[in-house]
Amino acid sequence: MAELTISAADIEGAIEDYVSSFSADTEREEIGTVIDAGDGIAHVEGLPSVMTQELLEFPGGVLGVALNLDEHSVGAVILGEFEKIEEGQQVKRTGEVLSVPVGDAFLGRVVNPLGQPIDGQGDIAAETRRALELQAPSVVQRQSVSEPLQTGIKAIDAMTPIGRGQRQLIIGDRKTGKTAVCVDTILNQREAWLTGDPKQQVRCVYVAIGQKGTTIASVKRALEEGGAMEYTTIVAAPASDAAGFKWLAPYTGSAIGQHWMYNGKHVLIVFDDLSKQADAYRAISLLLRRPPGREAFPGDVFYLHSRLLERCAKLSDELGGGSMTGLPIIETKANDISAFIPTNVISITDGQCFLESDLFNQGVRPAINVGVSVSRVGGAAQIKAMKEVAGSLRLDLSQYRELEAFAAFASDLDAASKAQLDRGARLVELLKQPQYSPLAVEEQVVAIFLGTQGHLDSVPVEDVQRFESELLEHVKASHSDIFDGIRETKKLSEEAEEKLVSVINEFKKGFQASDGSSVVVSENAEALDPEDLEKESVKVRKPAPKKA
């Protein structure tokens, strides 16, 4: 039998290997306990090192976000099924803040506020992840708005133009066409998408907050039928979701859009609507016992929206020149735009389009109130051709509304007043536009030219829309060089204007009004004299007293 020998060197080597591989580090894990839970909120004790906005893991893989950091407990918003969370259950820290997957694979998909697909089309291969609470671009990282974002809606592109990187508020009562305006804007980006040019393409994100499931489905169907889903992502937080999801949904959509913006691409994001996000945040704050302020909203509700909308920007060329344009929607009550949330968002954004229920009920759609609507920075992005033809449009419509109210009580009017009323009625009719039928900017320029230069004065009001559509078809079929020139040069040259006037007059000769009469060709049609308008506005403000 062989003798077993152990050398001292072997023993020494084994000990050295063990010592070198030994680690005295221990993992320290904080575990909290649920004190109470309900209505999507849980209070947890025993997590002294937790960070604000940190993700917490509840039993069953349910996640929560730490919002309130009190001395002895943590108030968390539950993201998921909170019904199964009970008192006494253990809660673990994750050491992470909330983030969502992002990338081009999200185009054409419907996701929830956690970035998980809910359209039944399988998993999404994300390129990377992006934190929801991301700092907005600083002043030196931005540049001024200079490129137009065409909505395809005549009233907006002519009077309240939107530029890439702008925040334009869409505000109005319920059922006034706010969502329709935004969906039309998304549909209008299709031509730019088909060019394949990254400098022209616009990727769209539609964030549905607190909407009915049927409403979200109808928007998705409209986008699919218009061929717009291939460049659109829908982030859905329907009314049936917990308040936490409605609060997070806009930040999720913003994170998805910012990924493209920082890669030098252009993004359009629609928040439909931020009133419901504010309501959800109010519910969360009250359940967390935060002190209420005006209309029971918490003190930081302004910051809730400002830090979201400030992420929309036109980045500097050093950062790629990408942009994210925001169209937040706010719902008013009884056309009151002086309420708390509307005034907050108006002060944050770069302009607003106010949709009025009275105009909507009169059949003026889109029901844009010209007097209250404004675009503070979009004018710099408007193409020169539109500036030239639509320069007097806002003034003409405002004076028409003023004179219309006065004319209702006046028995007789002079010729200048009647001419202004007739012109205004035709302009109102001209700016009406059916839903889901956006117009290219060159078609809009020709249409607005018809109204502001007096070429519709001899057309009966009830035939204005038919005259416009048939003329545009005629120009497209027989004189497409007019459209091509406007599209390529962004201007309406003198030669093109002269040709357009002759085309309009020729078209009038063959146009039959609905009553069978022919339209008078006015060779010298022109805009109303500004001096006459000024005199009329003075007369309106100071009408002569009637004789007894």
UniProtKB/Swiss-Prot annotation:
InterPro entries: ATP_synth_asu-like_sf, ATP_synth_asu_C, ATP_synth_asu_C_sf, ATP_synth_F1_a_nt-bd_dom, ATP_synth_F1_asu, ATPase_a/bsu_AS, ATPase_F1/V1/A1_a/bsu_N, ATPase_F1/V1/A1_a/bsu_N_sf. Keywords: ATP synthesis, ATP-binding, Cell membrane, CF(1), Hydrogen ion transport, Ion transport, Membrane, Nucleotide-binding, Translocase, Transport. Gene3D superfamilies: 2.40.30.20, ATP synthase alpha/beta chain, C-terminal domain (1.20.150.20), P-loop containing nucleotide triphosphate hydrolases (3.40.50.300). Its EC number is 7.1.2.2. GO terms for cellular component: plasma membrane; proton-transporting ATP synthase complex. Signal peptide: none annotated. It is an enzyme of class 7 (translocase). The record marks 373 as: Required for activity. Its main location: membrane. The keyword Lyase does not apply. It catalyses: ATP + H2O + 4 H(+)(in) = ADP + phosphate + 5 H(+)(out). ATP binds at residues 172-179. Pfam families: ATP-synt_ab, ATP-synt_ab_C, ATP-synt_ab_N. It is found in: Cell membrane. It is a peripheral membrane protein. It comes from the Bacteria. GO terms for molecular function: ADP binding; ATP binding; proton-transporting ATP synthase activity, rotational mechanism. Produces ATP from ADP in the presence of a proton gradient across the membrane. The alpha chain is a regulatory subunit. Belongs to the ATPase alpha/beta chains family. F-type ATPases have 2 components, CF(1) - the catalytic core - and CF(0) - the membrane proton channel. CF(1) has five subunits: alpha(3), beta(3), gamma(1), delta(1), epsilon(1). CF(0) has three main subunits: a(1), b(2) and c(9-12). The alpha and beta chains form an alternating ring which encloses part of the gamma chain. CF(1) is attached to CF(0) by a central stalk formed by the gamma and epsilon chains, while a peripheral stalk is formed by the delta and b chains. This is ATP synthase subunit alpha.
